[in-house]
């Protein structure tokens, strides 16, 4: 029962309904936030759990609104907040802010505005645009930066729009060391060359992953099956780890349901999903009370250096969250 929805909204509700009719216990693989909202609404009507490894829109935290949704990542409000912390460390006192008008972009915009206020950073110019906007439209917005003296530029948008944004950055010459660019998405291996050139030097948050026996086992299996070397600084690899953990999460919930001599139904599995507490490949997995969010997930801020000699995406860690205080620590200047 596998459906490839390409992170698009189109026909997502029908796709989820088709899976529900097959009497599945749970649905995994909700990645992008906008379609994940549709998935969560659709699955909740049938009491079917839906698990995400990448949809981090702030609104998806709401357990009352999305009672059958969970995610093995932290919400975007923490990601965006840490980007503002980094900008403050680099001396930013005013920024330009680009965001999409989908559910994720609007939620992220509220977070960025609140964090900027707390950091005494002035959002001088805001540019909003619809998800999947045309290259021409994004070009026109980025071109307006020429009329400003803003050197710190923020973007919160899904990956396809992030790629178009960096194409525009490259086109208009903003991929220069005097500019600091912060984006909420890590670009992937298949990103076009002109977008890669525009993205060199930008900062992006990603899930932090700690060494463990579970991770060692995953790496061994990953490398054997793919023929690739695990790269801890690659978004592709990190998301593969999170994707693996959503499978283990459902497995743990089913085992817990059986152990308690409960009937294995989607409702009982959902109740056990919320009680989960185990060591996954990406670290300890448990959930905040009254929320759909993973508890205490570490975050790293990465800097993109371009592609290396082997044609691989090259990111280096710049900062990470402290496991005790939750504050951002700069680890590489």
Where are these regions (language model features)?
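Extracytosolic ligand-binding ectodomains
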Residues: 1-333
């Amino acid at each position: 029962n596998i459906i490839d929805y390409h992170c698009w909204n189109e026909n997502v509700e029908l796709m989820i309904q088709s899976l529900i009719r097959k009497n599945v216990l749970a649905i995994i693989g909700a990645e992008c936030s906008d379609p994940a909202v549709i998935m969560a609404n659709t699955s909740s009507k049938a009491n079917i759990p839906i698990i995400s490894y990448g949809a981090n829109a702030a609104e998806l935290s709401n357990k009352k609104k999305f009672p059958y949704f969970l995610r093995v990542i932290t919400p975007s409000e923490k990601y965006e907040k840490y980007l503002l912390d980094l900008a403050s460390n680099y001396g930013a006192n005013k920024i330009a802010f680009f965001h999409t008008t989908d559910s994720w972009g609007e939620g992220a915009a509220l977070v960025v505005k609140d964090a900027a206020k707390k950091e005494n950073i002035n959002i001088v110019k805001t540019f909003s645009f619809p998800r999947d906007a045309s290259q021409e439209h994004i070009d026109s917005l980025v071109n307006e930066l020429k009329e400003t003296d803003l050197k710190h530029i923020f973007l919160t948008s899904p990956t396809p729009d992030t790629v178009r944004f960096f194409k525009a950055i490259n086109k208009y010459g903003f991929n220069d060391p005097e500019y600091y660019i912060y984006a909420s998405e890590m670009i992937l291996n298949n990103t076009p060359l002109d977008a890669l050139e525009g993205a060199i030097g930008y900062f992006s948050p990603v899930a932090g992953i700690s060494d463990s026996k579970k991770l060692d086992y995953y790496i061994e299996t990953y490398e054997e099956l793919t023929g690739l070397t695990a790269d801890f600084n690659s978004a592709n690899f990190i998301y593969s780890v999170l994707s693996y953990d959503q499978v283990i999460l459902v497995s743990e919930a089913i085992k817990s349901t059986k152990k308690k001599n409960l009937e294995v139904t989607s409702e009982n599995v959902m109740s056990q999903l919320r009680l989960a507490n185990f060591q996954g490949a990406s670290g300890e997995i448990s959930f905040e009370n009254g929320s759909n969010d993973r508890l205490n997930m570490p975050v790293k801020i990465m800097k993109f250096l371009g592609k290396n000699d082997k044609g691989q995406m090259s990111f280096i860690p710049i900062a990470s969250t402290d496991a005790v205080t939750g504050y951002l620590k700069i680890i590489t200047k």
